[in-house]
UniProtKB/Swiss-Prot annotation:
PANTHER family: ELONGATION FACTOR TU, CHLOROPLASTIC (PTHR43721:SF5), ELONGATION FACTOR TU-RELATED (PTHR43721). Residues 61-65 are annotated as: G2. Its EC number is 3.6.5.3. This is Elongation factor Tu, chloroplastic. One of its GO terms (biological process) is mitochondrial translational elongation. Residues 82-85 are annotated as: G3. The lineage of its organism: Eukaryota, Viridiplantae, Chlorophyta, Nephroselmidophyceae, Nephroselmidales. GO terms for cellular component: chloroplast; mitochondrion. It comes from Nephroselmis olivacea (Green alga). GTP hydrolase that promotes the GTP-dependent binding of aminoacyl-tRNA to the A-site of ribosomes during protein biosynthesis.
């Protein structure tokens, strides 16, 4: 069976459902796929059971259950991620297994914002999810319009507390379950034929309009983490790796950043699969020939980048998830002063954890396996670091935590 070719006709956007347990995230995900399936060619409906029994996948050595679905609206192609368990969300967002360009926050109109609603909003803020659209679910269970308005106000206020624009965020009421039931009974329902199905359309209209199309990786500034270094007699030194973002072409001036003082060099050759290229773009695995660089000047863990786009740092604040014993993590707590390895892009760097904070800003004196915590890290060597960058924490070769850089200190 020939593989179906991925047709790139519409812009692609990654989104996900977030919110408190049992507020209807998975039901909504199923409803969206069913509604979009009968209205756009490139979508297939998914049943609740298929999404709920999400397969396990690994990201940075951590097992996460995640369901990936895809669908199209008239203007866009969406990849949508839904996690069955709360712990899966925490791990997913921190490891960046599912990088979201925006999220649909599902809040039950009957209950209002609950503790996990707030935790997911906070997480979204900390890991850099740029936009949120709200779906007020279970509208059919709320008899009093005013109650629903109060819940909407409370959600907007909660979003504002976490520095999202609470006044501007679109809030769409509806019932995911009734929309799903209507679609299951009659899978060919069109817009305008059922009030609950129409609310799913209204939600996707809001997502289409409010969540901006992300800048493609190829349009960003060039960056490649060095994986290996070779010396070619008579030609010079070649650094290999995968282009993380942007593009690079022959003759470009680039910088070598991290571990040693930053140096400038010129790209004198590009190779991929033994073929020479004029230009290389995000996603390519390439070898880059560098002018005037000796093999000992460059090593795994450094990055090649467009000049003055990334700088080396040693101290940063991060949001970290610490693995449980069952996940292969530590069996015992650790304390300030703990010195594990930090695996960033392609290399391990030893670092010291200076201090921990809980979400409420209070000082934490120790961290238990399974905790999510803010920590200040100081590395023994400077490496190229930027806000939003992911890393793993390792000890003796095994992953004990995963984190994302929230602020650079030094």
């Amino acid at each position: 069976m020939a593989r179906e070719k991925f047709e790139r006709t519409k812009p692609h956007v990654n989104i996900g459902t977030i919110g408190h347990v049992d507020h209807g995230k998975t039901t909504l995900t199923a409803a969206i796929t069913m509604v979009m399936a009968c209205n756009t060619a490139g979508s297939k409906g998914k049943k609740y059971e298929d999404i709920d029994s999400a397969p396990e996948e690994k990201a940075r050595g951590i097992t996460i259950n995640t369901a990936h679905v895809e669908y199209e609206t008239a203007t866009r192609h969406y990849a949508h991620v839904d996690c069955p368990g709360h712990a899966d969300y925490v791990k997913n967002m921190i490891t960046g297994a599912a990088q979201m360009d925006g999220a649909i926050l599902v809040v039950s109109g009957a209950d209002g914002p609950m503790p996990q609603t707030k935790e997911h909003i906070l997480l979204a803020k900390q890991v850099g999810v740029p936009n949120i659209v709200v779906f007020l679910n279970k509208q059919d269970q709320v008899d009093d319009e005013e109650l629903l308005e109060l819940v909407e106000l409370e959600v907007r206020e909660t979003l504002s507390n976490y520095e999202f624009p609470g006044d501007e965020v679109p809030v769409v009421p509806g019932s995911a379950l009734l929309a799903l039931e209507a679609m299951t009974e009659n899978p060919s329902l069109k817009r305008g034929e059922n009030e609950w199905v129409d609310k799913i359309f209204a939600l996707m209209d809001a997502v289409d309009q409010y969540i901006p199309t992300p800048k493609r990786d190829t349009d960003k500034s060039f960056l490649m983490a060095v994986e290996d270094v070779f010396s070619i007699t008579g030609r010079g030194t070649v650094a290999t790796g995968r282009v993380e973002r942007g593009s690079v072409k022959l003759g470009d001036t680039i910088e070598i950043v991290g571990l040693k003082p930053t140096r400038e060099t010129t790209v004198t050759g590009l190779e991929m699969f033994q073929k020479t290229l004029d230009q290389s773009v995000a996603g390519d695995n390439v070898g880059i020939l560098l002018r005037g660089i000796q093999k000992e000047d460059i090593q795994r863990g450094m990055v090649l980048a467009a000049p003055r786009t990334i700088t080396p740092h040693t101290k940063f604040e991060s949001q970290v998830y610490v693995l449980t014993k069952e996940e292969g993590g530590r069996h015992t707590p650790f304390f300030p002063g703990y010195r594990p390895q930090f695996y960033v892009r392609t290399t391990d760097v030893t670092g010291k954890i200076d201090s921990f904070r809980a979400d409420d800003g209070g000082e934490a004196t120790m961290v238990m396996p399974g905790d999510r915590v803010k920590m200040v890290v100081e590395l023994i060597q400077p490496i190229a670091i930027e806000k939003g960058m992911r890393f793993a924490i390792r000890e003796g070769g095994r992953t004990v935590g995963a984190g994302v850089v929230s602020n650079i200190i030094a």
